[in-house]
Amino acid sequence: VSIENVDKPTLSQTDCICRILPLLFEFPVLLTAAATFVEKSYKNNITFVVGADTIARIGEDRYYNDEFSVDDAISVFSAKGIRFVVFGREMSELQHTGATTKGHFQSLKSLGLPSTLTKLCISVEESSFRSDLSSRDLR
């Protein structure tokens, strides 16, 4: 669970407790202040559970600087055995989610990500799970 995120405000201690408590007795949970997935990948063989909007951002150049590219990030993920379980999301054409940006449902397959990133992903199909609530709406 991320305390910090490049696109969102920092979580409070109360928010962190509320997020990890339901998971704590069933799954190992890592709480981190790392803002990017490359920073979060300091351990090997981590599986991240993300929405289609998040994996789309991971595959975008604008989230990296001139010295570190999307391809560099994917190489780090691959070398460290990082995997992503990806849930589809209702997204606008700009890949935004939430109540004010309705669009169409996007799954891992419909995003057009680099194949090297897609190979690191496990897709959860819409028929298995769909919720159109954004994390912002849940908070």
Segments the model singles out, each with a brief description of its role:
Residues 1-139:
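Nucleotidyltransferase catalytic core that binds NTPs
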